[in-house]
Amino acid sequence: MIDLKYLQNNFNEVSMKLQKKGVDAASLEHLQTLFKTLKEANAKLEAAKAEQNSMSKLFGQYKREGKDITELKAKVDANKEAMVPLQEAAREAEEALYAVALAIPNLPDDSVPEGADEEDNVELIKVLEPRSFDFEPKEHWDLAEKNGWIDFERGVKLAKSRFSVLRGDAARLERALINFFLDTNRERGFEEFCVPFMNNAAMLQGTGQLPKFEDDLFKIEDEDLYLIPTAEVPLTNMYHDEILAEIDLPVLMTGYTPCFRKEAGSAGRDTRGMIRQHQFDKVEMVAIAHPDNSDEVFDMMVQNASDILTALGLPHRVVELCGGDLGFSAAKTIDLEVWLPGQNKYREISSISNTRDFQARRAKIRFKDGKKNRLVHTLNGSALAVGRTLIAIMENYQNEDGTIEIPEVLKKYM
């Protein structure tokens, strides 16, 4: 959540920054009204409290002096009763402000490029040259069918559309990728975690999925539980409402989980193959960092994801997202896009974000800085999306007869 005090004192500046993310200034004006309502409610309540304190002191004085307190006591009781609706009004005003503030996205960094959507993202560098084929490369679904690797029909039968079944060598390759990703992340200093695949609403609110994106989540009926859309949720919230020692920063975490998303806004997009599924596997990196060095941690995470792709021999490019393509919680995001020769285009395979103190404020994650507590910075990113890496290997390592080679670094895992 953005700093409400900063928003109140710098409304025009915040409004201008959020326009970079496509947030209409008019939608923020309601917040100004709520700020005013809360200020007025608190002023009335504080005035009533001041009067109550004054009468309470007078009450004690009357008793010491032996004066008749009947009339004064009636006034004290009446004022106390009058404070009840004032307290309720202040509480309701604060809750209304908080509810609206939860739906306001994070401020983009000043360095984030201007732009409306992914077409305006900025390519920073290309890593590895795409392979030159002497035949027409096939797309992954054709290769999967030829090799019997992915069963889309049985995925639909078992669940619904956008589910699939991996079998044989594809299932083994999926497991190999997960182990390779986790091993690499651990070698870079990330501690491995195995976390619940369901989290409660408070955790999803902490990382920003709730309340704004509830329609994209799978909720467990009659339970305060949701299937996680990413391991970012449990890993970041590992320190929900906790105070860390400054010496322990940064905290680097990694974990493998399946991820579950309704893909509510993706109707008609990537309907064939495994690019966009309701359930997919991912290895996540999460960092809880000191505000002074979160940029260094961010660069390390980007490099780590790129190094994994390089080790797999997969051509990719590094792209900085423009304001209009930034996620809700992100202040800055770098995407890694892998080359898919069958589609003849780069596709996102990792998205690494620095949320600054946005998630930390929502999740109350702090560190002890001398005598005071400060909010940490939280960062997250894939290293990597497993299914999309599997697709990239299939398309980049295919032979003319449809068989698929295995990258050298994965052979020991298979």
UniProtKB/Swiss-Prot annotation:
Gene Ontology terms, MF aspect: ATP binding; serine-tRNA ligase activity
Pfam families to which the protein is assigned, alphabetical: Seryl_tRNA_N, tRNA-synt_2b
Enzyme Commission designation: 6.1.1.11
Amino acids binding L-serine: T230, A231, E232, E284, S382
Top-rank taxon, per record: Bacteria
GO cellular component, one term: cytoplasm
Pathway connected to this protein: Aminoacyl-tRNA biosynthesis; selenocysteinyl-tRNA(Sec) biosynthesis; L-seryl-tRNA(Sec) from L-serine and tRNA(Sec): step 1/1
Matching Gene3D superfamilies: Bira Bifunctional Protein, Domain 2, Serine-tRNA synthetase, tRNA binding domain
Locations listed in the record: Cytoplasm
Record's keyword annotation contains Cell division: no
Any GO BP: seryl-tRNA aminoacylation
Catalysis performed (reactions): tRNA(Ser) + L-serine + ATP = L-seryl-tRNA(Ser) + AMP + diphosphate + H(+); tRNA(Sec) + L-serine + ATP = L-seryl-tRNA(Sec) + AMP + diphosphate + H(+)
Residues that hold ATP according to the record: R261, K262, E263, E348, I349, S350, S351
Cystine crosslinks: none
Family membership: Belongs to the class-II aminoacyl-tRNA synthetase family. Type-1 seryl-tRNA synthetase subfamily.
Record note on quaternary structure: Homodimer. The tRNA molecule binds across the dimer.
Alphabetized NCBIfam families for the sequence: serS (TIGR00414)
Family matches, as PANTHER family: SERINE--TRNA LIGASE, SERYL-TRNA SYNTHETASE
Function, as annotated: Catalyzes the attachment of serine to tRNA(Ser). Is also able to aminoacylate tRNA(Sec) with serine, to form the misacylated tRNA L-seryl-tRNA(Sec), which will be further converted into selenocysteinyl-tRNA(Sec).
Domain-level remarks: Consists of two distinct domains, a catalytic core and a N-terminal extension that is involved in tRNA binding.
This protein's name: Serine--tRNA ligase
